[in-house]
A protein has these predicted regions:
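Catalytic lobes of large eukaryotic enzymes
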Residues: 164, 185-315, 319-322, 326-327, ...
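Interhelical loop segments of eukaryotic multi-pass membrane proteins
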Residues: 40, 44, 331-342
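Alpha-helical bilayer-embedded segments of polytopic membrane proteins, i.e.
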Residues: 1-32, 303-333, 342
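Charge-dense, low-complexity intrinsically disordered segments
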Residues: 6, 49, 53, 146, ...
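Membrane-anchoring hydrophobic helices of lipid-metabolizing enzymes
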Residues: 1-88, 93, 100-101
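Soluble catalytic domains of membrane acyltransferases
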Residues: 65-246
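Alpha-helical membrane-targeting segments
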Residues: 16-23, 27-38, 53-57, 68, ...
């Protein structure tokens, strides 16, 4: 009974951060609205400067819960530049917590307020946050044939003309990779095979349009492209089968003990501009991600096997110690009979 209560209480750990984050959102948006109204008679770049500062303060509070409160260990591979840069951030997508990983990296460059997102169009109806993300410089896009290239170019061009600092986060897969949604994975792999591209197993085939438009439109404004690969530990069975990545509540409950972030900085001048070559380039980056995730699975399995082996050795050692103590307390004649029978 007591154990069940403890387990249930622990599973509700996310209620505190959820209550704080949602509870403070109206006050944050109210203060932002007042500033937005006041800034209509001020230069546009001044609005973005103050907005970035206010957004950074709010996101720092959010990040505290995800990075400190949870106790999840963050392992970063690669060297993050110390100075702020204007970048496009490209990452694999498998969890509703993926956006917080961008915050974890941005804050290490003191660029948390500059984080903006390319989001699927349906998220603009998200209560409280949906409209604000657009005002903060984010871009809502529709998929495939409904993608509005002109609208995205116009939005990004207006930002760059003002000299707005840019940390634009894009998830090129367009939707989250979930090993339980086999139809989505099969369709993605079939499309890659049809286009003559390598078939990927642990990520989805990336869609190129939003990434290409962003890099092409802001090429003179950008310093680099950040190529990010995220792997959540603790989502493999002993047989090596992959479970879905943790949701935000699961992440806050530390159901993921460790998150691995592979950081790779790419010179924007080395990225091809022509759509055909850009598609190949982007797919090659996701091939590398696919291989990293395979290697990560192998390492996790080896770690799991090592832990099981250590437990087995420990249990065997305990058994032998018990046997020795038992033998020491046994009469000599009885011990000799046991050994002869053995």
């Amino acid at each position: 009974m007591l154990l069940s209560l403890v387990v249930h209480t622990y599973s509700l750990r996310y209620w505190l951060p959820a209550a704080v984050m949602i509870g403070t959102a109206p006050a944050y948006l109210l203060s932002w609205s007042a500033w937005r109204l006041l800034s209509t008679v001020l230069p546009s770049n001044l609005y973005h400067t103050v907005d970035d500062c206010v957004y950074s303060a709010y996101q720092s509070m959010v990040l505290f819960f995800f990075e400190n409160y949870t106790g999840v260990e963050t392992v970063i591979y690669g060297d993050i530049p110390e100075k702020k840069e204007n970048v496009v951030y490209l990452s694999n997508h498998q969890s509703t917590a993926d956006w917080i990983i961008a915050d974890m990296l941005a804050i290490r460059q003191n660029a948390l307020g500059h984080v903006r997102y390319v989001l699927k169009d349906g998220l603009k109806w998200l209560p409280l946050y949906g409209w604000y993300f657009s005002q903060h410089g984010g871009v809502y896009v529709k998929r495939s044939a409904n993608f509005d290239e002109k609208a995205m170019k116009k939005k990004l061009s207006s930002q760059t003309k003002l000299g707005t600092p840019m940390y634009l986060v894009i998830f090129p897969e367009g939707t989250r990779y979930n090993p339980e949604l086999q139809k989505v994975i099969n369709d993605s792999q079939a499309f890659a095979a049809k286009e003559g591209l390598a078939v990927l197993k642990h990520v989805l085939t990336p869609r190129m349009k939003a990434s290409h438009v962003a890099i092409e439109t802001m090429k003179e404004h950008l310093d680099a492209v950040y190529d990010i690969t995220i792997a959540y530990e603790g989502k493999l069975t002993a047989a090596g089968q992959r479970h879905p990545a943790p949701t935000m509540p699961e992440f806050l409950c530390k159901e993921c003990p460790r998150v691995h972030i592979h950081f790779n900085r790419l010179d924007v001048r080395e990225i091809p501009v022509e759509p055909v070559f850009f598609r190949r380039w982007l797919h090659e980056r996701f091939e590398i991600k696919d291989k990293k995730l395979v290697l990560g699975r192998i390492q996790c399995l080896l770690r799991h096997m090592s832990m099981c082996y250590k437990v087995s050795i420990r249990n065997t050692s305990r058994h032998m110690d018990c046997q020795r103590r038992h033998n020491r307390n046994m009469p000599l004649e009885t011990l000799r009979k046991h050994r002869r029978n053995a």
